[in-house]
Amino acid sequence: MGASLAININPQGAGATVGRAVPLTFVLATIGVLLVAYGFARICSRLSHAGSVFGLTGITIGPRAGVVAGWALLGAYLSFMLTTSMTAGIFGAEFLRGLGLYETTPGIVPWIIALLSVGIATLLAISPVKKSMATLLWVEICTTAVIAIIAVVVVVRVVGGNAPGGQRFTLDMFMVPPGTSTSTLFLGIVFGFLSFAGFEAAASLGEETTNPKRAIPIAIFGVALFGGLFYIVGTSVQMLGFGSDAAGVDAFSKSASLFGTLGEQYIGAVVGDLVTLGTAVSAMGCALATAVAASRLLFALNRGAFDGRGFTKVSPKTGTPISATLFVCGLAAAIIVLVRVAVTNTAFDLFAWSGTVGTLVLLVAYGLFSVGAWYYLCVRAPRQGHKAAALDYVIPLLAIAVIGYTMFRNVIPWPDTASGRANIVIATVWVVAIVVVIVAAPKTTRRIAQSLNSDEGLASEAGYLAVAVEEVDESLREHNVPTTSLATPAAPGTAQRGGSARAAKS
C-alpha cells in the first residue's frame, strides 16, 4: 500500500475505535511489523533468498503451511483490491468536490470511480503500458513530498499558536482516551497493519546484490522502520492539525482526505487538491498492484489444484495470466456493485470492511511465517550446525504474541455490529476452507505446493519500486549499458518482456 494512500485514509478506520489515540495504534503496529521483519531478515539472510511469505513458510514448516499462507495471501489481495479501489473512489470524488463540481459529494460518485479504477486496473494488468508503474512511482513520491511540506506547516502553525481553529500543541494522542480500555488499541491496530501490507516485498531489491545476506535485512528493516516513523509522525501531525479534543476527533473521522483537508485549511485549497488527486492516483496504482498479485497467485493455485485446467490462459505476448486476471477484476467489480445495491450506500463502509478482512487473513500468513521462523532458527538451523542467536528465541515469539492477541481482541468480545461479525466470519471461512482441502485432498495439496514453489515469481506482488527499477533496467539494456537486472525470472511456460518477467518477488 502506498504511503500517501495509507496515511490519508487508514487512520480514520482506527479513529473510529480509539479516538485521539490513533498515533498510539500505529506505534503498536510498527512494533509488530518490526518483530515480523526480524524473522524475514534472519530467514532471508540464512537462505540468501528473498522469498515470498508462503514460499518461506513452506520451506520452514512444510508445504501444507505454505499452501495455507498462499491461500491467505490470495484472500488478502482480493480484499485489498476492494480496499484500494474504493479508496480511489473516495479520493477521486473528494477531488471533484474540490474542483467545484458539487458542494456535497453525491453518494454514488465514489462507487462509480471505484468501478472505473477496477476497469483501468484490468486493462493495465492484461496489457501493461510501458513506463506506467514508473509514472505511478513518481506520483507517489511527489504526493509524499507535498504531505511532508503540509506536516511541517501544520506543526509550525500549531506550535506558534497560529492554527486556523485555535489548536494547541499537545501529546494527548499518545494517551488512551478516558473511557477507552487499553486493549481497544488492538482493534484499531488492524488499520496500522493494513498500512504495512506487503512490506516484505522490499527484500526483492536486496536479493540481486553482491551481498544479499546483508542487503536483504537492511531492505526489510529499512522499509518497516521508515514506514513506521512516517505513519507515527504523520498521524501525530494529523491529530495536532485537527485537534485532539472531541470536536477535532469528529472532524478527523469525517475528513475524506486527511492531509488534503489540512493542506486546504493550513495552506490553501490548491495544495489540498493536489494531495487528494495524488492519493487517488496512488490508490489506482495500488488497485493495479493487488490485481496483478491476486491474478498471478490465483493462476499458480489453480494450476496446482486442477492440474492445468481452469484459469490457465496466458498471453503469449506479455505472459499475463489473462483468465485469472479477468476473474479477479470481474469479481471485484461484482462485489462493489452487490454491496452498493444490497448492503450500504456509504463508500467508506466497504473500504473499512474489506481492509479488516484482508488484514485478518494477512495476519494468518504472517503468523504462520513467524512460527516457521522460530522453528527454523531455533530448531532446524542448530541441527545443521548454525547456532541460534539469543534474539532468535525471543523475537519471533513476540511477533506471534502480538499477531495472536490482535486477532483475539478482534474476536473477543464478539462484535455488536453485524458488519463486525461478518468480517470475522468471512476471514474465518476463507482460512478454514483451505484447511478442509488440505485434510480432504492431500494429493491436491502437494500439487498446489509444488506449483507455488515453482512459480514464486508468478505469484508475487507488483510493487511500485521493483517494477519501476526493472523498467530502468530495460531502458539501460536498450542502450547497451551493462546492468544487473532486479527483475524476477519468468516462470517456465510464460513469456518474458524485455528479457525479464513483470512480477517482483514479495
Predicted regions: what is each one?
Residues 1-8, 194, 331, 403:
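The first (N-terminal) embedded transmembrane alpha-helix
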Residues 12-23, 96-107, 129-140, 274, ...:
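Transmembrane helix-loop boundary segments of multi-pass membrane transporters
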Residues 22-23, 99-109, 138-276:
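Helix-loop-helix junctions that connect adjacent transmembrane segments
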Residues 49, 72-90, 196, 200-209, ...:
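Membrane-helix boundary/coupling elements in multi-pass transport proteins
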Residues 55-57, 62, 94-101, 219-291, ...:
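TM-loop-TM module centered on a large, flexible mid-protein loop between adjacent transmembrane helices
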